[in-house]
A protein has these predicted regions:
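Ligand-binding pocket scaffold of soluble enzyme catalytic domains
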Residues: 65, 436-437
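Residue-level detector of extended alpha-helical repeat arrays and alpha-solenoid scaffolds
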Residues: 365-366, 397, 427, 460, ...
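Hydrophobic core positions within HEAT/HEAT-like alpha-solenoid repeats
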Residues: 355, 370, 386, 398-401, ...
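Amphipathic alpha-helical scaffolding segments comprising HEAT/armadillo-like alpha-solenoid repeats
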Residues: 347-355, 378-390, 408-420, 439-452, ...
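Conserved, compact domain cores that house catalytic/ligand-binding motifs in diverse enzymes
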Residues: 359-382
Length: 480
């Protein structure tokens, strides 16, 4: 960053593999991969990782020397722009697909291993199915850096001055109606403004080319969730957003607002931030929950974060653009009330053990168990899933339903059980699964029709979407 390596601008991005000792401290760092083009995001997959680095690339170490000796391009054709708007935000979704944000750079993407036609992203984000290799447009892109899913599958993304946008209407719903305006399909949900007030404690509070943004979000990018293991007060369910110019991490608490959510500044932080630093090189760019239940914060450490394209030429000579490139940091953030977890070796867990982890309060454990179940494609046992759907926690029900769908094991009776669940979040996800099975539509119609009067606004919103997908003579009456 920002122009590549050396005078020629050759790819100089790297990935390091860290190993930890028994106390949870880093004991070694290995150069896992190098010569990558602006790597922005990484996701685990099978016995390797998938990285967003200009292309979507699979990396794998086959001989145990901590160096990736397999490098396979899964998707290519993404347009490149200013680095914070490149392909980023890789996240595994409940649907078993790898989701990413496009950053508004468009592109015509395709898989070198597939005969499928190239896909014009236009102004949309995307998802890749590892089982079929198929890539799809998902939501109108927010145009920013980063993506998160909450535990119920809702997705959020930032874009510079708009620090939190919810992806509301999927592309497939909008494309049924030619000319349907898409501008609000991914929309700001902040109750404290599109360019919200922030409270940095550092002296540099503005971008060189935007002095009017001092004291307000100007460079939001990189998001995370408060881990489910953090149970103190309003920490529960919180969303974190980084602002690299402000040297801070902001926290919002989510509240229902009709069929979507509203992000409100945390009550304990009305005039200060969740994390703020006086270090002008503190550049938070991402947050992740670890296997131990702690929150991990990535600090890019740069003296100058503004891209040179936006710095006036007459003052460019005053800046050392690469200062801090050798000082990246990772912080571990723990809650004083947090339960301490031993790292669970899910790689050796049985199918039944993985299903039991689908209701785990640690987001990492829950999501990893889900991913491994779908990766293994073991379709021999439905009983553990059915038990989770019938009597598990909200998250175990949701994950069990989607795991069965990812394994091709879902029966209409499973979905009907979810449609009648007492929790609206389970009903919403059951509707999304039903939408993927038009062969069940006529049989499920009576239940769906009755749900048009559901007391929950988010459920009613998804009823309207699904009625638009599946024609039926009584659809209009149900909507009215």
């Amino acid at each position: 960053h920002p122009y590549g390596q050396g005078p020629s601008g050759s790819p100089g991005g790297t990935i390091s593999k860290l190993t930890f000792d028994a106390s949870g401290n880093v004991s070694a760092s290995h150069l896992y991969a190098e010569r990558l083009s602006f790597p922005t995001s990484i996701a685990p997959y099978k016995d390797g990782v998938i990285v967003a680095a200009g292309d979507l690339i699979f990396l794998r170490d086959t001989d145990g020397d901590h160096i990736a000796d397999v490098r396979q391009t899964l998707l290519t054709g993404f347009n490149q722009g200013v680095t914070d708007s490149n392909l980023s935000g890789l996240r595994w979704g409940l649907d078993g697909r790898l989701h990413g944000v496009n950053g508004g750079n468009n592109g015509i993407i395709y898989s070198p291993q597939s005969a499928a036609d190239p896909l014009a992203l236009r102004n949309a984000d995307f998802a890749w199915n590892p089982l079929t290799g198929r890539v799809s447009r998902t939501y109108h892109t927010g145009g920013g850096f980063g993506l998160i899913f909450d535990r119920f599958g809702r997705s959020f993304t930032p874009h510079n001055i708009n620090h939190i946008l919810q992806r509301i209407l999927p592309v497939k719903a909008m494309e049924r109606f030619r000319g349907f305006p898409s501008i609000k399909a991914t929309s700001s949900i902040s109750d404290h403004g599109g360019m919200a007030r922030i409270y940095p404690i550092s002296t540099a509070q503005t971008r060189v080319n935007h002095p009017e943004q001092a004291g307000y979000f100007s460079s939001s990018g990189g998001m995370g969730l408060i881990p489910g293991t953090f149970t103190h007060g309003s920490l529960v369910g919180g969303v974190l957003v980084c602002d690299v110019v402000g040297n801070l991490v902001h926290r919002d608490v989510m509240y229902p607002k009709g069929p979507i959510l509203e992000a409100r500044r945390a009550p304990e932080e009305q005039s200060h931030e969740f994390i703020a630093s006086r270090d002008l090189a503190f550049r938070p760019v991402g947050l992740e929950t670890g296997p131990d239940g702690h929150l991990y914060l990535m600090d890019m450490q740069r003296g100058v974060i503004e891209h040179p394209d936006y710095i006036p030429e007459q003052i460019m000579g005053n800046y050392r653009i690469r200062e801090g490139a050798d000082r990246g940091r990772i912080y571990r953030v723990a809650s004083v009330d947090e339960t301490s977890y031993e790292n669970t070796n899910l790689a050796s867990a049985t199918h039944e053990e993985l299903v039991a982890h689908l209701g785990h309060e640690n987001d990492w454990v829950r999501g990893t168990a889900h991913r491994l179940i779908v990766e293994r494609q073991a379709t021999t046992n439905r009983s553990s899933f059915k038990e989770a759907i019938a009597s598990g926690s909200i998250t175990s029900k949701i994950h069990a339903l989607w795991c069965m769908n990812g394994l091709g094991m879902t029966h209409i009776e499973d979905v009907q059980l979810g449609l009648n669940d007492q929790h609206p979040e389970v009903r919403v996800q059951s509707l999304k699964i039903l939408e993927k099975h038009p062969e069940w539509w006529n049989q499920a119609w009576p239940v769906v029709q009755s749900m048009a009067q559901d007391p929950d606004a988010e459920v009613r919103f998804h009823i309207a979407l699904i009625l638009g997908c599946h024609p039926h003579p009584d659809n209009e009456a149900a909507l009215i």
